[in-house]
């Protein structure tokens, strides 16, 4: 329960940054469990390949392997929640140390608030810390349902794969196999969307924490405007998620058509495309986090050297 509390609670300002976060260990254990599931599916497939009569077992081994990949993604998501906790520890540490490091500066005259340019792109200068950008506020809300629903759908798909293995009627087997694939890959898409929202939550914490530190020093607050990489990240994330939902609907249609093989031939690449788009968005989110960290390093150095 203590580990779960770390997911949603900002640590107190006097929290020891050297402490080991339980949630990180949980994330690593979950990730290793996912690797074990994928390895088990691989071994099972090797045995199935040598037994033509057992080809129907490929249905459940598929379900197990996809469940393994989803479990690895869940482990990544859990570790990211620990990073959010570390981020707030960093904010509190900087708030405590920066006043002692800050150069003495004469009081500023009138300050021209508004848009400014920085080495890391356009920014704004405000008297108070700005609020979160709408996508960041949404990310803080949406990562939890996505991380919850994604594994649930993957497990539903795993159960369907077991029923597919035992189905005697070809039409029933076809329908179950289609729903297995569509359901599991919708769960995979939701998990990647949840990871994307967690990265958005990290960006939200960087924006909020950076403004909080500057405001606590009585300084004008410099905040990056949304970088271009963040805008493309949003496009890719929502595009990939919508495509993941679309493949689920299309697999539902394919479950009852006369020629499912034709549908399966292009639905397979389509579902992989949805995950690829989501992963590309995650790459841009990580790039954006690097940009924001660089900006904050530049701002901290500016405060230390100039006092402003």
Predicted regions and their residues:
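Short, Lys/Arg-rich, polar N-terminal cytosolic tail immediately upstream
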Residues: 1-17
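Charge-rich cytosolic interhelical loops and cytosolic tails of multi-pass membrane proteins
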Residues: 4, 97-137, 211-226
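Juxtamembrane interface helix immediately N-terminal to a transmembrane segment
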Residues: 12-36, 130-152, 221-241
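Membrane-helix interface motif
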Residues: 39-54, 156-172, 245-259
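Extended, solvent-exposed polar beta/coil surface segments
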Residues: 26, 33, 37, 52, ...
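Charge-rich, solvent-exposed alpha-helical interaction surfaces
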Residues: 26, 42, 62, 141, ...
């Amino acid at each position: 329960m203590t580990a779960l509390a770390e997911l949603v609670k900002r640590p107190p300002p006097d929290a020891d940054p050297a402490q080991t976060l339980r949630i990180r260990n949980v994330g690593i254990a979950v990730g290793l469990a996912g690797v074990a599931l994928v390895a088990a599916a691989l071994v099972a497939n090797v045995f199935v390949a040598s037994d033509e009569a057992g080809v129907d077992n490929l249905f459940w081994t598929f379900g197990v392997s996809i469940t393994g990949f989803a479990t690895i993604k869940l482990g990544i998501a859990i570790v990211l929640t620990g990073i959010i906790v570390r981020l707030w520890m960093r904010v509190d540490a900087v708030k405590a140390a920066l006043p002692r490091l800050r150069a003495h500066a004469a009081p500023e005259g009138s300050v021209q608030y508004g848009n400014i340019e920085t080495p890391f792109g356009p920014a704004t200068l405000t008297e108070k810390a700005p609020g979160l950008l709408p996508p960041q506020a949404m990310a803080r809300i949406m990562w939890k349902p996505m991380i919850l629903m994604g594994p649930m759908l993957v497990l539903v798909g795993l159960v369907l794969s077991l029923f597919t293995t035992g189905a005697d009627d070809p039409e029933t087997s076809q329908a179950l196999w289609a729903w297995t694939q569509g359901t599991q890959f919708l769960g995979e898409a939701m998990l990647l969307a949840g990871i994307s929202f967690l990265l958005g939550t990290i960006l939200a914490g960087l924006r909020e924490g950076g403004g909080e530190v500057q405001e606590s020093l009585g300084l004008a607050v410099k905040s990056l405007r949304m970088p271009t990489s963040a805008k493309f990240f949003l496009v890719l994330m929502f595009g990939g998620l919508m495509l993941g939902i679309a493949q689920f609907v299309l697999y539902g249609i394919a479950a009852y058509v006369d020629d499912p093989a034709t549908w399966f031939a292009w639905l397979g690449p389509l579902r992989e495309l949805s995950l690829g788009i989501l992963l590309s968005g995650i790459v841009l989110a990580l790039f954006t986090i690097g940009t924001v960290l660089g900006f904050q390093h530049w701002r901290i150095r500016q405060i230390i050297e100039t006092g402003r």
